[in-house]
């Protein structure tokens, strides 16, 4: 299982200016993260820490989510064509297939 979160990505053709958590209360879209109450700490997160809302650091004891993120803000999302009409989409429903395709490409590399 791969938990996908969302970001707001400010970029041009050559560089990323900023990337932050996607949280657009005005349009009702948002993503978040935290520490799972159900899933054990995976080996790849051992030794990592997180911040409390007050800024204090603590060691992860359970799985931190999301595992990965991608541009999910519809304002900065993906240009697509639907029924002949160009539009921009976003949301973690756009991020999840993006990561699925990336994982598939990595798994298809020789020697894996």
Enumerate the language-model features and the residues they cover.
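Extracellular protease catalytic domains of secreted zymogens
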Residues: 1-112
């Amino acid at each position: 299982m791969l938990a996908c979160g969302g970001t707001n990505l400010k970029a041009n053709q050559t560089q990323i200016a900023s990337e932050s958590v996607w949280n657009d209360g005005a349009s009702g879209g948002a993503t978040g993260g935290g520490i799972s109450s159900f899933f054990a700490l995976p080996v790849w997160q051992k030794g990592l820490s997180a911040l409390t809302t007050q800024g204090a650091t603590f060691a992860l004891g359970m799985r931190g989510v999301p595992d990965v993120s991608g541009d999910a803000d519809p304002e900065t999302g993906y240009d697509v064509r639907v029924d002949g009409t160009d539009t921009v989409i976003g949301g973690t429903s756009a991020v999840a297939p993006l990561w699925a395709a990336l994982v598939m490409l990595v798994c298809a590399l020789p020697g894996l």
